[in-house]
Amino acid sequence: MRIGLMIGPERGRYATKVDRLRADARWADQAGLATVWVPQIPDEFDALTAAALAGAETSRIEVGTAVVPIQPRHPIALAQQALSTQAVCGGRLSLGLGVSHHWIVDEMLGLPYERPAATMRAYLDVLDPALGGPGPVDVENELFRVHNPLDITDVGPTPVLLAALGPAMLQLAGERTDGTLLWMADERAIGSHIVPRLTRAAEAAGRPPPRVVAGIPVCLCRDDEVDAAVARTNRILAEAEVSPNYQQLLDRGDAREVGDLLAAGGEAAVERRLRSFADAGATDISVRVVPIGDDRDQLVASLRRTRAFLAELTTSFASPAAPASPGEPASPAVESKAVDTGAGSR
């Protein structure tokens, strides 16, 4: 199983946002992690722009978006941005896409949120050839009429993963993409709902085994601090729970809130919980570090402890190198001074 790290800016700390994002990407690259995942938050950095920054600062690690909503962007516009980012990343970009949520697309953006799976299928009809390499894109379907040349990079096809939670999107992800990106999915939801549907669809389409990237909050702490870590996780990450999409996914598992997904405690407890996701069928873990503490110094120390342990786990989990240019990772001792105080929840 591959271990990746969610990175992203803290809200409100404007002067150092870019430097901190770069530092986080460098740390993950040098520490040997498989992937850095950049979230798309409605009021924050654009994920593909941030991914380009991360790619320019690194040489080995996979850089992924988690996830870019399709509704605000024409598929050719997204393809241009993704291919431009791929050129910066040197072939290390994986494009995570999603249909977002009704309360974002309709209520915040004023765009229609209808037939999301059908919309994504029509979108991929355009995006697939656009990401496949230089040349014309000629597609006409129920939503798009496109006759557009693209000649941005000759880097091979850009991997695409879908934020697929329900049966229709899982079917589409297995048929047409490289896998799925998950949030709010516990072990039972992954093992009994996600993996079987996704795998069957991929097999029927003659595609290779799909990736299953599970987003998991993690806090390395003492046993007597676990309750505080759970409370903090619920406080800073509970916003997603209001989405019907995530509620339906929670209903398919044993978790009832995001704190139930937290891998917390000592090294053995954290490793055991992460391995339980691998046993359920996750191919990747995208770690959202949740630091705890009463002040900024304690938060920084907590974040560093958890990250250092993640670097150690990459070896014991035998995470393969991400598809990237060759390069030996440096010592994981290099650490960013940034700390996520919880503002940048997904």
Language-model-detected regions and their locations in the chain:
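Active-site-adjacent structural elements that line small-molecule/cofactor binding pockets in enzymes
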Residues: 1-346
